[in-house]
Amino acid sequence: MKATSLLTGWTCRHLGDTAPGKTVTLPHDAMLAEPRTALSAGGTNTGWYEGYDYEYRRTLTVPENALADTHILEFEGVYHNAEVWLNGQKAAFRPYGYTNFYVDCAPYLHAGENELRAIARNADQPNSRWYSGAGLYRPVQLWTAGDKHILLNGVRIRTVSLEPAVVEIRVRTSAPGTVQLMVEGLPTVRKESDGEAVFTLTIDNARLWTPETPNLYRCRVQFADDEAVETFGVRTVRWGKNGFTLNGERVIIQGACIHHDNGLLGAVSDPDAVARKVRLLKETGYNAIRSAHNPCSKALLAECDRQGMLVMDEYIDHWYIHKTEYDYVPYFAEWWRQDLTDMVEKDYNHPCVVLYSTGNEVSETAQKRGIALTKEMTDFLHGLDDSRPVTCGVNIFFNFLSSIGFGVYSDEKAKKEAEKAEKAKAKGKAVKKKSVGSKFFNDLAGLLGDEFMKRGATLHGCDVKTRDAFANMDIAGYNYGIYRYKHDLKKYPQRLILGSETFCNDAYKFRELAKAEPRLVGDFVWAGMDYLGEVMVGSWEYEDYAKNFDGGLGWVSAGSGRIDLTGKPLGEALYTRVALEKDNGPYIAVCPVNHTGDRHSPSAWKMTNAMPSWSWTGCEGQKASIEVYARAARVELWLNGRIIGRKALKNDCFAKFSVTYEPGKLEAVSYDARGCELGRCTLTTAGQQTQITAGPEQSSVQAGHLCYIRLRYTDETGITKPLARGNIKVEVDGGTLVGLGNACP
C-alpha cells in the first residue's frame, strides 16, 4: 500500500471553541502550549501543565476515480481517548494514548473534499504518572491501494537460522496472484499467493545485525500494482540456561529506561530528536532501551535498528488497579488484546526489538486474578510472536507492601481526592493530594534512600508475592531487587532474571554479577535521560533553586536522568561508561563546590550531582568533594602539581577525594596492579573573561530538520563556567526556534 504523509494542513483548537483553530504541523503536542498553574489537577505528575480536550481538523481530497480504492488512516499516537470523524460520522474510537491504530475510511468517504476531525481528550486529569503530552503527538498517514494489494503490515520477516543464514518472509495479499520478492544481493523470486505466500531465502555470507554491527537488509515486495518495502536484520534471539543470546553469543543487556517525551519539545515524536536520544544513550554505554511504560514510536524503532540499540517494548503502567484517577483501567479489559496485537505488528520486523514487557509495577501480580492474567498475556504474546521472550517489571517490595494494604490506590480514595480537588479549584486554591500507589512508594524511597527499597525486597513475603507471577513469564522482571539475585538464582534454577528497573549506583555491581551468572540477563537503570513530569523524583536541588523541596510550581521535570533534559551527559553518565565497560576512564567529576555541606532535595534515584568542572568562581578556600571513576587497581588525584591522595579501587570503580578548592589544574591518573599507568584525565579552571558560546551539534542541517545548539557561559577558550548566570535572548534567522530551555528540573 502507498503511504501519504498527513503532517501538514491541520488546525487545532480546544474542543468546543468556536474560534478558528491554529494551524499546526504534526507531530504536535498541544499540552506543551498550555499554562502551568498551581491549580493543575495533574500537579507533580504532569509538571503542573493544565489539561484540555482538543479538536484537530483537515481535509482529505479523494479523486472520483480513486473512490473505490482502499483508504486506511494510520494514527501512530493520539493522547488520549481518540475519536476519528469523517464527514460528520464517527469512524473510530481508540482509548489508549500510546498505541498506533488504523481507521478504514471506505464507509465514510465521497469524491472530492472530505472533512477529517480527530479529537484527543486530556481534560480528565490526572490520567498519567508523568507528562503525557496531548493531541496528535506522533505522525498520521493515509494508506491507499487498489483492489489487489499487499495487506497493511502484510510482510513479516524472521530469521530462521544462521549457519546458513535463512530468513522466512510471509506476504499476505488481498487476493490471489503472483508475488515478486527482491532482497538486495539475492536473485528475484516469485510465488503464487492464495492470500499468503511464504518465501524461504538463504543468504550466503550474511551480514548479521548486532549492537556493534547493525547491518540492515532491504526487502521489496510487489503484487499487482502494489509495492511494500521493509528493512530487516539477520539475527536470532534465544533465552535459557545460557542466558540471553543474540546470534548464538551471550549478550548482557545493559539498558536504560526512557519515557516518550523529548525534553524541550514535549511529547513530539520528532525523528531527529529520537535519533539524538538514542545516540546519546549509546555513547553513555547502554546497549538497550526500555520503553517505559508504553509502546514506543516507530521513529524510535527505526533509529534503534540503524544505530544498534536493543529494545524492550513495554505495554502499560497498570492493569485493572488504578494508579491515577482517570487512567486506562476502565478500558483495559476490553482493549488489551488489540493493543498488544498492534504493538507486535509494529515491532515484528525490527531486529532491535528483543523483549516484550506486559507492564510496570503492576501490583496485580500479587493477586490470584493478576497471576492468571500474567499467564494469559504472556501466552497471547507468544501466539502473536514466539521469537521474543516476555517479561513484566515487578517491584518486588511494593508487591508485598500492597498485599498488606500499604499505599494501595482505591476508587473510594480517588473519589475523595477528586472532590477535594474540585472544591479547592473552585476557591482558587491548590490542594496537596495524598500519595498512593507508585508515588507513595517513590516518595518513601526518596526519603529513606535506595537501600530501603533494595533491603525491603529481601523479605520472605516479597518472594511469596511474586513467585507465581514470575513463573508465568519467560524472564522475571525485578524492579529494584538486586539483593535477591544470588539467592533467587539458586532457589529457582530455571529462572532467568532481568533487572527491569534499577538504581544508577548499582551499575558496577550488576555488571560484575552478570559476567559471572548467565541467567542474570540484563539491567535497565531508572532513568537514562531526564523527562518531563513526575517532578523532583530523581533530583538533588538546593534551597536557592527549590525552597522547601515541595515539588511545587517551579518544577517541571523528574531530574533522574544520567543525561539531563537538554541532552548533556552528567557525572553519573561518566560513572556509567566506566561501570558498564564502555571504557575504563578515568573521569573526574566535582560536586557543586558552592553547596558543599548544604542540604538538597531527597531522591533515591540520584547517585551524585557531580559534574566534570573545576571552575567554581568565588569558592576559593571551600571544601570540594571530588569523584574519580575508573576501572583500575588504584587512582591518584593531583592538584596544581601536588598529590592530593591515592585510593585503591576494590569492588567498585568509584573513588572519593576531598580538597580545599583553588583554581588551576586538577588531574586524575589510573594505574593497574603492577603500577603501570592506564590513563589520565584533567580539568582546568576557566579564565577571567566570560562570554556566551553557541555550539551547534551538527556542522550542517537540511531544511525541515532539527539542529541542537548548546548555549554556555565560557571563558575565551571554551571552558564552561557552571556558576555564571544571566538572561539570554535568542533570535533565529532562516529557521524556526522550536524549543529553548535549561536542564534545571
Q: Where in the sequence are the language-model features?
A:
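Accessory beta-strand-rich segments of carbohydrate-active enzymes
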Residues: A3-G16, A30, T46, G51-L151, ...
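Core domains of carbohydrate- and sulfate-ester-processing enzymes
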Residues: T4-D53, C105, A118-N153, N242, ...
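Extended acidic/polar, glycine-enriched regions
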Residues: H110-A111, R170-W239, F654-K656, T660-G664, ...
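Active-site-adjacent substrate/metal-binding segments within catalytic domains
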Residues: P35-V62, A66-F75, Y79-L86, A92-P95, ...
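Short flexible loop/turn segments that cap and initiate beta-strands
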Residues: V179, E212-L216, K623-S625, R631-A633, ...
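Substrate-binding clefts and catalytic carboxylate motifs of secreted carbohydrate-active enzymes
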Residues: T4-L7, T11-T18, V78, Q125, ...
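Aromatic/hydrophobic beta-strand junction motif of beta-rich domains
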Residues: F75, V167-A175, G248, A624-A630, ...
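Conserved structural position at the C-terminal beta-strand
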Residues: A120, V221-F223, S670, Y713
